[in-house]
Amino acid sequence: MSKKDCILAIDQGTTSTRSIVFGKDAQALAISRREFPQHYPELGWVEHDVEDIWRDVLATARETIEEVGGPERIAALGITNQRETIVIWDRETGRAIHRALVWQDRRTAHECNLLRQQGKEAMVREKTGLLLDPYFSASKIAWLLDHVPDARRRAEAGELAAGTIDSFLLWRLTGGKRHATDITNACRTSLFNIHTQEWDEELLKLFNVPRALLPEVCDNSSDFGETEAKLFGEKIAIGGMAGDQHAAVIGQACFHEGMAKATYGTGCFMLLNTGEKPIMSNNRLLTTIAYRIGGKTFYALEGSIFVAGAGIKWLRDGLKLITHASQTDDMATRIPDSHGVYMVPAFVGLGAPHWDPDSRGLICGLTLGSTQAHIARAMLESVAYQTYDLIRAMREDGAMRTSILRIDGGMAVNDWFAQFLSSMLKAEVERPVNIETTALGAAFLAGLQVGLWKSLDEVTATWKQERVFAPKMDPAQRRIMIDGWHDAVRRTLTPSAPVAHSSVETTASQAA
C-alpha cells in the first residue's frame, strides 16, 4: 500500500479552478487548471453557474490525483475559494436555485445605501468588521430569497441551504452529509459576529435571512468529513477550508502580529496580521478574522482592491492590446514611464479605502504620443498605487509597523511590477519560491488536521524566499507620480462616496 504523503488542494477562484497536489516539502507535484465562463446578465451583475465550477473541481482534482499515482497517496484534501460569492441550493437535490452571485456583483448597492441612510452601518461594522457594501454576502442572500419564486418560504421551511463556494463544494463532495463552512468564509457574509464568533441574530434580522439556511461554522483545520468514494476512487478526508485571502496568509506563513501579505489575483487583497485582538480601522479598512486553528483566533486588517489581474484580462479580452498577460512586463519595460497616462480601474467601483460602488473606470492623460505600452503600463501602475493607498491607511491606523510585504498571485511573477511596487511603497517586497500560496495555505490546513505537518512552526520552515525587491525610485519623482494618481482618483469618485480619513485629499508628499 502506498504511503499517504500528499495533500490535494482545491483552489476555486473567480475566473478559474485549480487543483494542486503538494508533498510534505510544500512543493507542487501536480497542477491542473480550468477557466470557466462569467455571466453578466445586466450592468453591474456578475454570476457563476455552480455546475461549471463543480465540473471543473472534479476534472482538475482527478487529473492531479492520477498524475501522482492515485488516491492512495492523498492524506487529505483542503479547499480554498473566492470569498463572499453566494449560492443557495435545494437540500434534497443539491441543485442551485439560481446562479451564484459573485463578490463583484453590485445589484444590491441600492439596498446597502438604504441601510446606510438608516444609520445601520455602525452596528454592522462593530459586529462584523465590515462595511455596508454589496461586496459582502448578506444582501445577496436577501436578493435571491426575494427574487427567486418561492425561495423565502422554502428557506424558512428548511428546504434550502446557503453558503459560500466552499460550503457548496463540501456539500457536493460529501454527498450532502455536511453543511459547514470555516470561520474565515463565515466572517465575510455580514451575518457573523467576529467577537462572539457566531451567527448574529440582530444581523440576521437586519438582512432578513433565516438562520435555517446557514451552515455550521468550524475552525480552519477541522474534520469536515470525507469525500464520497465514487468521486476519486476512495474516500479522502477533508481537513481544511479557508477563504482565498486567508489561505494565502497561511501559505505565506504570516503567523505573527505585524506580518503582511498581498495577493494579486483577479483583485488584490492585502491582509495584515493584528494578533489576537481585532483592530477597528479609522480609514475604512476591513477588520476580519485571519484564521482560527485549535480554537485560537488571529485577526487581520484587510484592504480590498477589486481589479488587479482582472485589469490585465480586460487589456487582453476587452481592448485586445495583448494576447497573453506576460506581455505587459515587456511593454512596461520598453518605455521609460507612462507618459502621464493614468488608469483608474474602477470597473466595478472602488474598494478600500474609498468604498465607492458607483465610481467607474477612467483613463486620463492621453496625448497623440500615447501608445498601447503606455496604457498597459498605466494598468500595472494602478495596482501598485492602490496598494500604496492601502498601506498608507494601515500606517495611519497604527497597525502597519513592518517595512516588508510578502506578495503572491499571478501578477507577482512580473518582475517590473514587483520592482515598481517596492518603489511606490518604500518597502521591501518579498516574493516566495512558491507563489501558489492560496492553494498551499489550504494544503497546510488540511495537512495540520491529519498530522502531515505537526505545527505552525513546521509550516513556517517550508517558506522560502525567491527574490526580494528594494525601492529604487527618486523620492521627488515618486511623490509627483502618486499625486498624479490621486488627482485621477478624485475624478472618478461620486459626490456621495464616503471619504476615509486616509483620503485622496491628503497629498502624497504629506503622507509619504
From Swiss-Prot:
Is ATP-binding included in the keywords of this UniProt record? yes
Activity regulation statement: Inhibited by fructose 1,6-bisphosphate (FBP).
- What EC number(s) has UniProt assigned to this enzyme? 2.7.1.30
Mind listing the GO biological process terms from this record? glycerol catabolic process; glycerol metabolic process; glycerol-3-phosphate metabolic process
Give the pathway.
Polyol metabolism; glycerol degradation via glycerol kinase pathway; sn-glycerol 3-phosphate from glycerol: step 1/1
* CC per GO annotation: cytosol
Annotated ADP binding sites: T14, R18, T266, G309, G410, N414
Q: Which InterPro entries match?
A: ATPase_NBD (IPR043129), Carb_kinase_FGGY (IPR000577), Carb_kinase_FGGY_CS (IPR018483), FGGY_C (IPR018485), FGGY_N (IPR018484), Glycerol_kin (IPR005999)
Q: What reaction is this protein's catalytic activity?
A: glycerol + ATP = sn-glycerol 3-phosphate + ADP + H(+)
Q: Which domain of life is it from?
A: Bacteria
Q: Does the keyword Transferase apply?
A: yes
What's in the keyword line of the UniProt record?
ATP-binding, Glycerol metabolism, Kinase, Nucleotide-binding, Transferase
Q: Name one Pfam family in it.
A: FGGY_C
Q: Which PROSITE patterns match?
A: FGGY_KINASES_1, FGGY_KINASES_2
The residues that hold ATP are: T14, T15, S16, T266, G309, G410
- Positions binding sn-glycerol 3-phosphate in this chain are T14, R83, E84, Y135, D244
Write down the Gene3D superfamilies for this protein, in alphabetical order. 3.30.420.40
EC main class here is transferase
Q: Which GO terms describe its molecular function?
A: ATP binding; glycerol kinase activity
Indicate which residues the UniProt annotation says bind glycerol.
Answer: R83, E84, Y135, D244, Q245
Q: What is this protein for, i.e. what is its function?
A: Key enzyme in the regulation of glycerol uptake and metabolism. Catalyzes the phosphorylation of glycerol to yield sn-glycerol 3-phosphate.
Q: Which family does it belong to?
A: Belongs to the FGGY kinase family.
Name-wise, this protein is Glycerol kinase
Q: Organism source for this protein? A: Gluconobacter oxydans (strain 621H) (Gluconobacter suboxydans)
Give the taxonomic lineage as stored in the record: Bacteria, Pseudomonadati, Pseudomonadota, Alphaproteobacteria, Acetobacterales
Q: Which gene encodes it?
A: glpK
